[in-house]
A protein has these predicted regions:
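Generic structural signal of hydrophobic/aromatic residues within well-ordered alpha-helices
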Residues: 1, 93, 97, 153-157, ...
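Short, basic/aromatic recognition patches
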Residues: 1-14
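Acyl-donor binding region in acyl/amide transferases
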Residues: 12-14, 21-162, 166-167
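Short beta-strand element of the conserved SAM-dependent methyltransferase core
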Residues: 18, 32, 211-213
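Long, charge-rich alpha-helical interaction segments
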Residues: 144-208
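A positional "C-terminalness" feature that preferentially activates on distal terminal regions of long
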Residues: 198, 202, 206-247
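Conserved small/polar residues in nucleotide/adenosyl-binding loops
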Residues: 248-257
C-alpha cells in the first residue's frame, strides 16, 4: 500500500492492521515506535532536557507514529490518513504499550512526509483535533545507501576503524540492545566524513512538520518530573468509538468529553 520501503526501528515497536468491522477490508497500517530522542520544537514545548529524557527514562512514556499509511481510496477520498492518525491516540495503543513495556503512554509524536516542500507545508495532521503542530525539523535527512554500499561501508569500517566498528555493530547493552543508539546512521556519517564525501551528496535539506498530542492535560509537567503518574488528568476521550466519530460525525455524539 506504499512505495516506501519498510525499515524497522531499533527499540520498541507496536504493529497494527486497521480493519473495518463491517466489510472486513483493510483500512491501513500503523506502527508505533520508540520516540525521537531529539526534536527541538517538541522538546521546547514540553520544557524538558536531554538528561530528563534519557537519565530518568521519561522518553519511554512517549511514542512516535513511525508508520501511518491508509489504503486507497480511503486515504484520498475519505481522509483515511487522518483516521489512522487519530487511532494512534487510542486506548488500544495505550493499553498495549503499558502491557508490553510497562510504561504509561502520555503523549504521541509524528512527523509529516513532505514538510515545507509540498502543499504549502500542509499535511494530513494539520487542523486535526488533538494534534498540535510544533513546527519543523531542522531539515537534514540522510539518504539511505543501497545494500551493496552499506556492506562496503561496514567492511571499510571493520578494516580501518575496528574500534568504531565494534562500538556500532558488535557491542551490546545488558538489555541486549545495540550499545549505540542510531548506530547505522552514525556509522554511515562517520564513514562519509572520513572518506571526504560531501554532505550535499548524502543528505537532503528536507524539513518535516512535527506534530504532538499530549494525552493528559498535565503531560508536560509529568515528563519534566514535576508530578507523579497518579496525578495525570486525561485530556480527552481516547476510545476508538469517539475518535472515529470525531472525524466522520459532526458534531460527535461524544464530543462533550474533552
Amino acid at each position: 500500500i506504499s512505495t516506501a520501503e519498510n525499515n524497522n526501528n531499533v527499540g520498541r515497536n507496536l504493529y497494527y492492521y486497521i480493519i473495518d468491522k463491517v466489510t472486513k477490508k483493510y483500512l491501513g497500517t500503523i506502527c508505533m515506535s520508540s520516540d525521537y530522542l531529539d526534536l527541538t520544537p517538541r522538546d521546547n514545548y514540553i520544557g524538558w532536557t536531554r538528561e530528563k529524557k534519557t537519565d530518568d527514562k521519561m522518553i519511554n512514556y512517549t511514542t512516535v507514529g513511525s508508520t501511518i499509511v491508509p489504503t486507497q481510496p480511503l486515504g484520498f477520498n475519505y481522509v483515511g490518513g487522518k483516521l489512522l492518525a487519530l487511532l494512534c491516540l487510542s486506548d488500544k495503543v495505550q493499553n498495549d504499550w503499558k502491557k508490553l513495556y510497562g510504561d504509561r503512554l502520555v503523549s504521541v509524536t509524528t512527523t509529516s512526509l513532505y514538510g515545507k516542500a509540498k502543499a504549502g507545508g500542509m499535511s494530513q495532521y494539520d487542523n486535526l483535533k488533538h494534534w498540535k503542530k510544533m513546527g519543523y525539523s531542522q531539515g537534514s535527512v540522510a539518504y539511505k545507501p543501497k545494500k551493496e554500499t552499506t556492506k562496503r561501508l561496514r567492511d571499510w569500517l571493520k578494516k580501518y576503524h575496528s574500534e568504531k566498528y565494534f562500538e556500532w555493530y558488535v557491542a551490546l547493552k545488558p538489555s541486549g540492545q545495540p550499545y549505540k543508539r542510531d548506530h547505522k546512521n552514525r556509522s554511515h556519517q562517520f564513514a562519509f566524513s572520513k572518506l571526504g564525501i560531501d554532505k550535499s551528496i548524502v543528505r537532503s535539506e528536507h524539513q518535516r512538520g512535527i506534530y504532538y498530542s499530549p494525552l493528559y492535560t498535565n503531560t508536560c509537567e509529568f515528563l519534566r518530573g514535576e508530578i507523579s503518574e497518579d496525578k495525570l488528568v486525561k485530556s480527552f476521550d481516547t476510545s476508538t468509538e469517539y475518535l472515529v466519530c470525531l472525524l466522520y460525525t459532526s458534531p460527535s455524539p461524544r464530543d462533550s468529553f474533552r
